[in-house]
Protein backbone atom coordinates (compact mmCIF):
# COMPACT_ATOMS: atom_id res chain seq x y z
CA UNK A 1 0.00 0.00 0.00
CA UNK A 2 1.24 3.45 -0.85
CA UNK A 3 1.70 5.69 2.18
CA UNK A 4 0.45 9.27 2.13
CA UNK A 5 1.35 12.39 4.03
CA UNK A 6 -0.90 15.30 4.93
CA UNK A 7 0.10 18.94 4.87
CA UNK A 8 -2.98 20.14 6.77
CA UNK A 9 -6.33 19.02 8.17
CA UNK A 10 -8.19 19.41 4.88
CA UNK A 11 -6.85 16.07 3.70
CA UNK A 12 -8.10 14.10 6.73
CA UNK A 13 -11.26 12.81 5.06
CA UNK A 14 -9.46 11.78 1.87
CA UNK A 15 -6.71 10.07 3.84
CA UNK A 16 -9.23 8.17 5.97
CA UNK A 17 -10.99 6.98 2.82
CA UNK A 18 -7.73 5.67 1.36
CA UNK A 19 -6.87 3.78 4.53
CA UNK A 20 -10.37 2.32 4.79
CA UNK A 21 -10.30 1.09 1.20
CA UNK A 22 -6.86 -0.44 1.72
CA UNK A 23 -7.99 -2.21 4.87
CA UNK A 24 -11.15 -3.59 3.22
CA UNK A 25 -9.45 -4.62 0.02
CA UNK A 26 -8.06 -7.83 1.50
CA UNK A 27 -5.13 -9.77 0.10
CA UNK A 28 -4.08 -9.12 -3.47
CA UNK A 29 -4.18 -11.96 -5.96
CA UNK A 30 -0.61 -12.82 -6.86
CA UNK A 31 0.17 -14.05 -10.38
CA UNK A 32 0.78 -17.72 -11.08
CA UNK A 33 4.38 -17.85 -12.29
CA UNK A 34 5.07 -21.48 -11.47
CA UNK A 35 6.00 -22.21 -15.08
CA UNK A 36 8.88 -19.71 -15.05
CA UNK A 37 12.36 -21.15 -14.51
CA UNK A 38 15.44 -19.71 -12.84
CA UNK A 39 16.45 -17.58 -15.81
CA UNK A 40 19.75 -15.73 -15.75
CA UNK A 41 22.38 -17.54 -13.70
CA UNK A 42 24.00 -15.69 -10.81
CA UNK A 43 26.48 -16.64 -8.12
CA UNK A 44 26.40 -15.19 -4.62
CA UNK A 45 29.76 -13.59 -3.87
CA UNK A 46 28.93 -12.69 -0.30
CA UNK A 47 26.13 -11.74 2.07
CA UNK A 48 26.02 -9.49 5.11
CA UNK A 49 23.56 -7.85 7.48
CA UNK A 50 23.05 -4.10 7.70
CA UNK A 51 21.33 -4.53 11.06
CA UNK A 52 17.59 -4.15 11.46
CA UNK A 53 16.71 -3.28 7.86
CA UNK A 54 14.07 -0.72 6.89
CA UNK A 55 11.17 0.21 9.17
CA UNK A 56 9.02 1.57 6.34
CA UNK A 57 8.57 1.10 2.60
CA UNK A 58 8.63 4.90 2.33
CA UNK A 59 12.25 4.98 3.47
CA UNK A 60 14.89 5.34 0.76
CA UNK A 61 17.52 3.04 2.27
CA UNK A 62 19.52 1.67 -0.64
CA UNK A 63 23.15 0.48 -0.99
CA UNK A 64 25.74 2.85 -2.45
CA UNK A 65 28.80 1.61 -4.32
CA UNK A 66 31.78 3.96 -4.45
CA UNK A 67 35.55 3.50 -4.64
CA UNK A 68 35.55 -0.29 -4.27
CA UNK A 69 33.28 -0.17 -1.22
CA UNK A 70 29.62 -0.79 -0.52
CA UNK A 71 27.82 1.36 2.03
CA UNK A 72 24.41 0.67 3.55
CA UNK A 73 22.31 1.87 6.48
CA UNK A 74 19.42 0.58 8.60
CA UNK A 75 16.51 2.37 10.25
CA UNK A 76 18.01 2.02 13.71
CA UNK A 77 20.90 4.33 12.87
CA UNK A 78 23.67 1.95 11.86
CA UNK A 79 25.82 2.71 8.82
CA UNK A 80 28.25 0.06 7.54
CA UNK A 81 30.99 -0.17 4.92
CA UNK A 82 32.14 -3.39 3.24
CA UNK A 83 34.82 -4.23 0.72
CA UNK A 84 32.89 -4.61 -2.54
CA UNK A 85 34.90 -7.60 -3.74
CA UNK A 86 35.27 -9.70 -0.61
CA UNK A 87 32.40 -8.51 1.59
CA UNK A 88 34.79 -7.85 4.48
CA UNK A 89 33.29 -5.39 6.92
CA UNK A 90 35.50 -2.32 7.12
CA UNK A 91 33.61 -0.24 9.66
CA UNK A 92 30.24 0.23 11.32
CA UNK A 93 28.96 3.24 13.26
CA UNK A 94 25.79 3.88 15.23
CA UNK A 95 24.51 7.39 14.55
CA UNK A 96 21.91 7.23 17.31
CA UNK A 97 19.15 8.43 14.95
CA UNK A 98 16.33 6.80 13.02
CA UNK A 99 17.64 6.85 9.47
CA UNK A 100 15.26 7.08 6.53
CA UNK A 101 17.39 7.78 3.45
CA UNK A 102 20.77 6.96 2.01
CA UNK A 103 23.54 6.41 1.89
CA UNK A 104 24.73 8.71 -0.81
CA UNK A 105 28.48 8.43 -1.36
CA UNK A 106 31.18 10.48 -3.05
CA UNK A 107 33.88 13.05 -2.41
CA UNK A 108 35.11 11.13 0.62
CA UNK A 109 31.71 11.34 2.33
CA UNK A 110 28.90 8.95 3.18
CA UNK A 111 25.59 10.83 3.53
CA UNK A 112 22.48 9.64 5.36
CA UNK A 113 19.21 11.39 6.20
CA UNK A 114 17.20 10.99 9.39
CA UNK A 115 13.53 11.14 10.40
CA UNK A 116 14.26 14.21 12.55
CA UNK A 117 15.51 16.19 9.55
CA UNK A 118 19.20 15.83 10.30
CA UNK A 119 21.59 15.20 7.43
CA UNK A 120 24.74 13.39 8.56
CA UNK A 121 28.04 13.35 6.69
CA UNK A 122 30.43 10.55 7.66
CA UNK A 123 34.03 10.03 6.63
CA UNK A 124 34.02 7.34 3.94
CA UNK A 125 37.34 5.96 5.18
CA UNK A 126 36.41 5.24 8.80
CA UNK A 127 32.80 6.32 9.43
CA UNK A 128 33.69 9.22 11.71
CA UNK A 129 31.19 12.05 11.76
CA UNK A 130 32.30 15.03 9.67
CA UNK A 131 29.28 17.28 10.18
CA UNK A 132 25.53 17.36 10.83
CA UNK A 133 23.11 19.81 9.22
CA UNK A 134 19.47 20.32 10.16
CA UNK A 135 16.88 20.49 7.36
CA UNK A 136 13.27 21.56 7.71
CA UNK A 137 11.63 18.10 7.90
CA UNK A 138 12.30 14.37 7.63
CA UNK A 139 14.62 13.26 4.83
CA UNK A 140 13.13 10.55 2.61
CA UNK A 141 15.30 11.03 -0.49
CA UNK A 142 18.87 9.83 -1.02
CA UNK A 143 21.35 12.75 -0.64
CA UNK A 144 23.75 13.38 -3.51
CA UNK A 145 27.18 15.00 -3.75
CA UNK A 146 28.98 16.50 -6.74
CA UNK A 147 31.71 19.13 -7.05
CA UNK A 148 31.90 19.29 -3.25
CA UNK A 149 28.25 20.36 -3.00
CA UNK A 150 25.79 18.12 -1.17
CA UNK A 151 22.23 18.17 -2.53
CA UNK A 152 19.49 17.01 -0.19
CA UNK A 153 15.71 17.10 -0.28
CA UNK A 154 13.44 17.30 2.77
CA UNK A 155 9.97 15.82 3.03
CA UNK A 156 8.29 19.21 2.73
CA UNK A 157 9.62 19.61 -0.82
CA UNK A 158 12.59 21.89 -0.14
CA UNK A 159 15.89 21.18 -1.91
CA UNK A 160 19.16 22.24 -0.24
CA UNK A 161 22.68 22.83 -1.48
CA UNK A 162 25.26 22.40 1.30
CA UNK A 163 29.02 22.85 1.46
CA UNK A 164 30.57 19.37 1.38
CA UNK A 165 33.36 20.36 3.79
CA UNK A 166 31.31 22.00 6.52
CA UNK A 167 27.61 21.33 5.89
CA UNK A 168 26.97 25.07 5.68
CA UNK A 169 23.88 25.95 3.70
CA UNK A 170 24.72 27.48 0.31
CA UNK A 171 21.21 27.71 -1.16
CA UNK A 172 17.65 26.49 -0.83
CA UNK A 173 14.94 25.88 -3.44
CA UNK A 174 11.52 26.22 -1.84
CA UNK A 175 8.22 25.39 -3.53
CA UNK A 176 4.82 24.88 -1.94
CA UNK A 177 3.50 21.32 -1.98
CA UNK A 178 -0.07 20.11 -2.51
CA UNK A 179 -2.35 19.39 0.42
CA UNK A 180 -2.07 15.63 -0.03
CA UNK A 181 1.00 13.83 -1.37
CA UNK A 182 2.54 10.38 -1.28
CA UNK A 183 4.85 9.79 1.65
CA UNK A 184 8.39 9.70 0.42
CA UNK A 185 10.29 11.85 -2.06
CA UNK A 186 12.04 11.26 -5.35
CA UNK A 187 15.78 11.70 -5.02
CA UNK A 188 17.50 14.56 -6.86
CA UNK A 189 19.71 13.67 -9.80
CA UNK A 190 22.93 15.60 -10.40
CA UNK A 191 24.20 15.82 -13.99
CA UNK A 192 27.23 18.02 -14.50
CA UNK A 193 26.37 21.40 -13.01
CA UNK A 194 22.63 20.73 -12.92
CA UNK A 195 20.27 19.26 -10.37
CA UNK A 196 17.09 17.59 -11.66
CA UNK A 197 14.21 17.32 -9.18
CA UNK A 198 10.76 15.75 -9.55
CA UNK A 199 8.31 17.78 -7.49
CA UNK A 200 5.09 16.83 -5.72
CA UNK A 201 3.09 19.26 -7.87
CA UNK A 202 3.76 17.28 -11.06
CA UNK A 203 6.52 19.56 -12.35
CA UNK A 204 10.13 18.74 -13.19
CA UNK A 205 12.67 21.41 -12.33
CA UNK A 206 16.36 21.79 -13.13
CA UNK A 207 18.51 23.89 -10.81
CA UNK A 208 22.03 25.28 -11.03
CA UNK A 209 24.21 23.20 -8.73
CA UNK A 210 26.27 26.19 -7.60
CA UNK A 211 23.50 28.59 -6.52
CA UNK A 212 20.17 26.73 -6.75
CA UNK A 213 18.73 29.08 -9.38
CA UNK A 214 16.05 27.61 -11.63
CA UNK A 215 17.33 26.85 -15.15
CA UNK A 216 14.00 25.56 -16.40
CA UNK A 217 10.78 24.09 -15.08
CA UNK A 218 8.46 21.83 -17.07
CA UNK A 219 5.00 20.41 -16.35
CA UNK A 220 4.90 16.61 -16.53
CA UNK A 221 1.32 16.18 -15.34
CA UNK A 222 -1.44 18.67 -14.49
CA UNK A 223 -3.63 17.97 -11.42
CA UNK A 224 -7.20 17.00 -12.33
CA UNK A 225 -10.33 16.19 -10.32
CA UNK A 226 -12.31 17.73 -7.50
CA UNK A 227 -10.77 16.15 -4.43
CA UNK A 228 -7.23 16.44 -3.12
CA UNK A 229 -6.88 12.69 -3.58
CA UNK A 230 -7.82 12.84 -7.26
CA UNK A 231 -5.43 15.74 -7.87
CA UNK A 232 -2.31 13.93 -6.63
CA UNK A 233 0.35 13.96 -9.36
CA UNK A 234 3.56 13.49 -7.38
CA UNK A 235 6.70 12.83 -9.38
CA UNK A 236 7.44 10.13 -6.83
CA UNK A 237 9.76 8.04 -9.00
CA UNK A 238 13.34 9.26 -9.27
CA UNK A 239 13.89 11.20 -12.50
CA UNK A 240 16.09 9.51 -15.06
CA UNK A 241 18.56 11.49 -17.17
CA UNK A 242 19.93 9.62 -20.18
CA UNK A 243 21.77 11.04 -23.20
CA UNK A 244 20.53 14.59 -22.81
CA UNK A 245 16.91 13.77 -22.01
CA UNK A 246 15.19 13.78 -18.61
CA UNK A 247 12.38 11.28 -18.05
CA UNK A 248 9.78 11.73 -15.31
CA UNK A 249 6.66 9.81 -14.31
CA UNK A 250 3.70 11.11 -12.30
CA UNK A 251 1.48 9.23 -9.90
CA UNK A 252 -2.04 9.36 -11.43
CA UNK A 253 -0.55 11.29 -14.35
CA UNK A 254 1.73 11.10 -17.34
CA UNK A 255 5.19 9.90 -18.29
CA UNK A 256 7.18 12.56 -20.15
CA UNK A 257 10.53 13.04 -21.88
CA UNK A 258 12.01 16.53 -21.53
CA UNK A 259 15.11 17.92 -23.23
CA UNK A 260 17.82 18.81 -20.73
CA UNK A 261 19.01 21.74 -22.83
CA UNK A 262 15.77 23.72 -23.05
CA UNK A 263 13.22 22.00 -20.79
CA UNK A 264 10.86 21.37 -23.70
CA UNK A 265 8.72 18.25 -23.80
CA UNK A 266 9.83 15.71 -26.42
CA UNK A 267 6.89 13.37 -25.92
CA UNK A 268 4.34 12.30 -23.30
CA UNK A 269 2.38 9.11 -22.59
CA UNK A 270 -0.52 8.33 -20.29
CA UNK A 271 1.43 5.80 -18.20
CA UNK A 272 1.05 6.70 -14.50
CA UNK A 273 3.29 5.18 -11.86
CA UNK A 274 5.59 5.80 -8.92
CA UNK A 275 8.28 3.12 -9.08
CA UNK A 276 11.06 4.22 -11.42
CA UNK A 277 12.67 3.82 -14.82
CA UNK A 278 15.72 2.50 -16.64
CA UNK A 279 17.10 2.98 -20.15
CA UNK A 280 19.52 1.51 -22.63
CA UNK A 281 20.70 2.69 -26.04
CA UNK A 282 17.31 2.05 -27.67
CA UNK A 283 14.54 1.84 -25.11
CA UNK A 284 13.06 3.29 -21.93
CA UNK A 285 11.72 0.77 -19.41
CA UNK A 286 9.05 1.82 -16.93
CA UNK A 287 6.62 0.16 -14.49
CA UNK A 288 3.07 1.52 -14.40
CA UNK A 289 0.59 1.67 -11.51
CA UNK A 290 -0.71 -1.83 -12.34
CA UNK A 291 2.77 -3.42 -12.18
CA UNK A 292 2.97 -3.76 -15.93
CA UNK A 293 6.41 -3.28 -17.44
CA UNK A 294 6.62 -1.19 -20.63
CA UNK A 295 9.41 -0.79 -23.14
CA UNK A 296 9.14 2.47 -25.09
CA UNK A 297 11.14 3.93 -27.95
CA UNK A 298 13.26 6.59 -26.27
CA UNK A 299 12.97 8.95 -29.24
CA UNK A 300 9.20 9.15 -29.58
CA UNK A 301 7.63 7.18 -26.71
CA UNK A 302 6.08 4.54 -28.98
CA UNK A 303 5.34 1.18 -27.35
CA UNK A 304 7.82 -1.57 -28.24
CA UNK A 305 6.32 -4.20 -25.91
CA UNK A 306 4.46 -4.59 -22.62
CA UNK A 307 4.92 -7.36 -20.06
CA UNK A 308 1.75 -8.04 -17.99
CA UNK A 309 2.59 -11.27 -16.16
CA UNK A 310 3.91 -9.49 -13.04
CA UNK A 311 0.61 -7.74 -12.29
CA UNK A 312 -0.31 -8.15 -8.63
CA UNK A 313 3.30 -7.94 -7.40
CA UNK A 314 4.87 -4.86 -5.86
CA UNK A 315 7.87 -4.28 -8.08
CA UNK A 316 11.00 -2.19 -7.81
CA UNK A 317 12.21 -0.02 -10.64
CA UNK A 318 13.82 -1.98 -13.49
CA UNK A 319 17.59 -2.23 -13.75
CA UNK A 320 19.72 -2.87 -16.85
CA UNK A 321 22.79 -5.03 -16.33
CA UNK A 322 24.92 -6.96 -18.81
CA UNK A 323 22.33 -6.87 -21.57
CA UNK A 324 19.62 -8.06 -19.19
CA UNK A 325 16.64 -6.36 -17.56
CA UNK A 326 15.77 -7.22 -13.96
CA UNK A 327 13.20 -6.13 -11.36
CA UNK A 328 12.93 -7.26 -7.73
CA UNK A 329 9.62 -7.79 -5.92
CA UNK A 330 7.93 -8.08 -2.54
CA UNK A 331 8.27 -11.89 -2.52
CA UNK A 332 12.07 -11.72 -2.59
CA UNK A 333 12.43 -12.63 -6.27
CA UNK A 334 14.52 -11.21 -9.06
CA UNK A 335 12.45 -11.18 -12.26
CA UNK A 336 14.51 -11.37 -15.46
CA UNK A 337 13.07 -9.86 -18.66
CA UNK A 338 14.39 -10.12 -22.23
CA UNK A 339 14.90 -6.49 -23.38
CA UNK A 340 14.25 -7.32 -27.04
CA UNK A 341 10.74 -8.76 -26.68
CA UNK A 342 9.70 -8.43 -23.03
CA UNK A 343 9.54 -12.16 -22.31
CA UNK A 344 9.76 -13.17 -18.65
CA UNK A 345 12.74 -15.49 -18.99
CA UNK A 346 13.31 -16.38 -15.35
CA UNK A 347 12.78 -15.76 -11.65
CA UNK A 348 15.10 -16.60 -8.79
CA UNK A 349 14.40 -16.10 -5.10
CA UNK A 350 16.80 -14.47 -2.67
CA UNK A 351 15.08 -14.93 0.67
CA UNK A 352 11.48 -14.47 1.74
CA UNK A 353 11.65 -10.84 2.76
CA UNK A 354 10.38 -8.06 0.47
CA UNK A 355 12.89 -6.27 -1.74
CA UNK A 356 11.59 -2.69 -1.70
CA UNK A 357 14.38 -0.87 -3.53
CA UNK A 358 15.90 -1.70 -6.92
CA UNK A 359 19.12 -3.73 -7.06
CA UNK A 360 22.24 -1.62 -7.52
CA UNK A 361 24.36 -2.66 -10.52
CA UNK A 362 28.13 -2.24 -10.64
CA UNK A 363 29.75 -3.84 -13.66
CA UNK A 364 28.54 -7.45 -13.68
CA UNK A 365 27.59 -7.43 -9.98
CA UNK A 366 24.19 -6.67 -8.44
CA UNK A 367 23.88 -5.53 -4.83
CA UNK A 368 20.54 -6.55 -3.38
CA UNK A 369 19.11 -5.27 -0.07
CA UNK A 370 16.08 -6.95 1.52
CA UNK A 371 13.68 -5.28 3.95
CA UNK A 372 15.18 -7.22 6.87
CA UNK A 373 18.64 -5.79 6.19
CA UNK A 374 20.18 -8.73 4.31
CA UNK A 375 22.68 -7.46 1.75
CA UNK A 376 23.82 -9.77 -1.04
CA UNK A 377 26.39 -9.34 -3.80
CA UNK A 378 25.44 -11.36 -6.90
CA UNK A 379 27.58 -11.80 -10.01
CA UNK A 380 26.12 -12.69 -13.39
CA UNK A 381 27.32 -16.06 -14.69
CA UNK A 382 27.44 -15.98 -18.47
CA UNK A 383 27.11 -19.17 -20.51
From Swiss-Prot:
Part of the outer membrane protein assembly complex, which is involved in assembly and insertion of beta-barrel proteins into the outer membrane. It holds the Pfam family PQQ_2. InterPro entries: BamB, PQQ_b-propeller_rpt, PQQ_rpt_dom, Quinoprotein_ADH-like_sf, WD40/YVTN_repeat-like_dom_sf. A lipid is attached at residue 24 (S-diacylglycerol cysteine). SUPFAM superfamilies: Quinoprotein alcohol dehydrogenase-like. Belongs to the BamB family. HAMAP family: OM_assembly_BamB (MF_00923). It is a lipid-anchor. GO terms for biological process: Gram-negative-bacterium-type cell outer membrane assembly; protein insertion into membrane. It is found in: Cell outer membrane. This is Outer membrane protein assembly factor BamB. Keywords: Cell outer membrane, Lipoprotein, Membrane, Palmitate, Signal. The keyword Transmembrane helix does not apply. Its main location: membrane. A lipid is attached at residue 24 (N-palmitoyl cysteine). Residues 1-23 form the signal peptide. SMART domains: PQQ. One of its GO terms (cellular component) is cell outer membrane. Part of the Bam complex.
